[in-house]
Amino acid sequence: SKNFITPFDREDIHALASALDDIADYVHGSANRMYLYNLTTVTEPMKKLADLIHLGCKDIHKGISELRDLKNIRNVTDSCVRINSMENQADYVFDMAVADLFKNETNAIELFKNKEVLNALERATDKCEDVANVMETIIVKNA
């Protein structure tokens, strides 16, 4: 019988898979809300948050690829730093977008619909940061 040897703990693999699933859940949730709430306009902040999620996911891919053999730890930490920076940018975009909604949107229902979509997108960026945290934990345990 052959055993599958993992490069790191099963708990870390589970944490990584769960965090990745959370990103997908929030991205799906934002699209689902747009559909269910019949939102026909994608606002600039929504586009910006989607772009930031995409950047975060690209860095997640880079980081996870480097975790396979743990030879290029610096590349993983660089990805994690970029993901953390992306999440901070997303917080700013979200805060400004919500402030703009409260300032300019006179229809309370439209305000709520847009805020819900923005919130789901922003939470996806938070989950990207969670993945970065798991990758950093794996590095610390295996360095």
Locations of regions flagged by a protein language model:
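Cytosolic, long alpha-helical scaffolding segments
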Residues: 1-143
